[in-house]
Amino acid sequence: MKRFLSTFVFYLTLFMGQSMAGIFNPEVHTLPNGLQIIVVPNDIAPIVSIGILYKVGTADDPLPLMGISHFLEHMMFKGTKTVSASEFKKIILRHGGSTNAATSFDYTIYETEIAKEYLELILKLEADRMANLSFTEEEIKSEKDVVFEERRMRVENHPFGQAYEVLLKALSWYHPYGIPPIGYPHHIQNYSFETVHNHYKTWYTPNNAIIIIAGKTSLAEVKPIVERYFGDLPSRTIPARQRFTEPTHQGITQHIEQKNPRNSLIMLNWYYNAPNHRVGETKHYYPLIVLSQILGGNSTTEFYRFLVEEKKLALSVRSSYEGDSYDPRSFGISATLSPNMDVAVFKKALSDYLKGILEKGVSEEELRKAKRDLLAQLAFIRDGNNSTLSVFTSLASGFSIEQIEKWADYIQAVTLEEVHAAAKVALSDLPVATMDLHPG
């Protein structure tokens, strides 16, 4: 514990005491075919985390085939002409590594963590499946069953899965963010060899991919390996990311309420329209990050102290700001109420608290503490290879490397007036959706 605290204090002093232009100090190179290489050296351990990031997510899927990006993620483990489906993961495990993948609304990433000496092996495997993925119609049919089962676990058999899907649609009437990344059953049923293969050939091309490597290596070491295996892969024309623009909800609030016997406590949620880093009043992006930290970043905030510790109205409160997405999403506030707490009493207390922020803003101490906590979190992210990969996935959502590198400077520069203005933009109107989850 003493070592943890001393490390925490060291990083806190470092982050608060100097300009942060250069958080990760990535080494960057782009091949002639458009493939970008980003290397973040980290000598803490002789391992590397390798991420192959594709700038395509389920919000880019064609309407009859929503979720096909997630399905293709599954099929990417089916092998190539030289590496069988069963062999791909076995090779990595045999060399002491681990591999995983994730598909979001805005990107798909394939990650492997392994000893540095096997870096070339992984890049060879990734280049092979970027260009030579091989699967059959029968494997498509079989994998559909796997995804149907995954959907049952996530949605039908999850206490809040269906409520979450209704919430997505309430927040996004027309935008594809309103459809869950896994898709609906009728979408999954429509997948075929042709549609999956076309999706692969459309988006999985070097000029739509970024190789991100964090760990004990350097660009000088990585570049010739990437050139050897990826350099001859041809680039292709990438379609524009065509998404429906979400219209104004014209003051409509949709309320979702669910009773579930597997839920033992009342959970309340409010979601407000908010600009993001790329669309709308983007000047509010960094102040909204700070506001979210002030409201529900951790159990030491004034917001938490008032509602949980002083008034004992809730067991927990938190906030979320989804400003990093490619298109605007929401600013959310959620709470798990104390046992036997009256919902109306809590809502009144929350409403009064938010009105106070809208009228008076937040305090200098709250601003200082929020910045300190955000920058301390960043210090520990920087030391982790996998967390570093996660940060750089924002490149698929429209961020630049410069924005990532100057993130801490932008946070440091946020003023009380900017937080107050951002709060008025996000919280003055009625929420676009609320969701109350009750015991059955």
Residue ranges of each PLM-predicted region?
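His/Glu-based metal-binding/catalytic segments typifying zinc-dependent metallopeptidases
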Residues: 152, 169, 238-302, 410
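Non-catalytic, conformational "gating/processing" segments within enzyme and secreted inhibitor domains
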Residues: 197-229, 431-432
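Positively charged n-region of N-terminal signal peptides that target proteins for export
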Residues: 1-4
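Mature N-terminal segment immediately following signal peptide/propeptide cleavage
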Residues: 22-51
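M16 family metallopeptidases and their MPP-like homologs
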Residues: 40, 45-71, 85-130, 162-186, ...
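Short, polar/flexible loop-turn hinges at active-site or ligand-entry regions and domain interfaces
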Residues: 78-81, 130-138, 362-363
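Active-site His/Glu-centered metal-binding helix of metallohydrolases
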Residues: 68-76, 291
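Bacterial N-terminal signal peptides
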Residues: 6-18
